[in-house]
């Protein structure tokens, strides 16, 4: 167990390596691809131009690993508030980040994601991934209206914000608030659902938002074929189905 800025961290080995932060599961070797592939590929497989990417959180390296598969990415800024997460992941969870940590396009910044976004110039990033833990003292602002507005400001006109948007079961109110907030700020937003067995209730969500019409259904098919071969979970059919899985109780809440 290690103490860090945001709490106590533990790497568990007995039933497959996993990372726990203050009693909450963050990731595991067994389940992480359910999460990381769903966060990254719906956004990046729809982009065919040179792009700058920002990852807020993501200290385990999984989001970076999926991003570096795309040749059109010019730059990746990883902004992680807790350096210990990166150190622990590199030492004990090497299988997640792997060689992606050494990619020349990657720059690691130990910094507060909210402050980083505020000091970034307009229209700088083409894709922003919010790969953060559940709302807490240290991450609440990453779910706020003001933060999402700042993300919109620093995105290019056709840029995409991709965020984990919690469980519609275990964190229903937070989930609905995220969806309503993004819908209010961006022209379009779409949410997909899938399984992440290690997380509360086992069902999770990811939301994608843009100021232009999202092209998530208009993928670069050559890119899709190449990326699908390297994925364990994600493929285009999986994605298309996952975007149609919104529980009816969530639909009713959003329409009310």
Regions found by a protein language model. Give the residues of each.
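SAM/dcSAM-binding transferase cores
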Residues: 8, 180, 201-256
């Amino acid at each position: 167990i290690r103490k860090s800025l945001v709490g106590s961290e533990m790497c568990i080995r007995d039933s497959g390596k996993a990372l726990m932060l203050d009693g909450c599961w963050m990731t595991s070797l067994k389940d992480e691809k359910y999460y990381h592939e769903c966060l990254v590929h719906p956004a990046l497989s729809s982009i065919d131009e040179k792009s700058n990417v920002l990852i807020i959180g993501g200290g385990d390296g999984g989001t970076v690993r999926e991003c570096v598969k795309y040749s059109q990415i010019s730059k990746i800024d990883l902004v992680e508030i807790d350096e210990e997460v990166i150190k622990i992941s590199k030492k004990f969870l090497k299988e997640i980040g792997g060689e992606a940590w050494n990619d020349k396009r990657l720059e690691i910044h130990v910094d507060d994601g909210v402050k980083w976004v505020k000091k970034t110039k307009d229209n700088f990033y083409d894709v922003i991934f919010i790969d953060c833990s559940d709302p807490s003292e240290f991450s609440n602002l990453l779910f706020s209206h003001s933060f999402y507005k700042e993300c919109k400001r620093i995105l290019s006109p056709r840029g995409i914000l991709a965020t984990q948007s919690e469980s519609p079961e275990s964190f229903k109110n937070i989930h609905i608030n995220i969806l309503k907030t993004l819908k209010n700020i961006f022209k379009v937003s779409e949410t997909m659902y899938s399984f992440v067995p290690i997380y509360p209730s086992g069902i999770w969500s990811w939301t994608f938002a843009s100021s232009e019409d999202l092209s998530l259904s208009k993928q670069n098919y050559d890119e899709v074929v190449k990326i699908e071969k390297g994925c364990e979970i994600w493929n285009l059919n999986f994605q298309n189905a996952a975007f149609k899985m919104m529980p009816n109780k969530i639909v009713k809440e959003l329409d009310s």
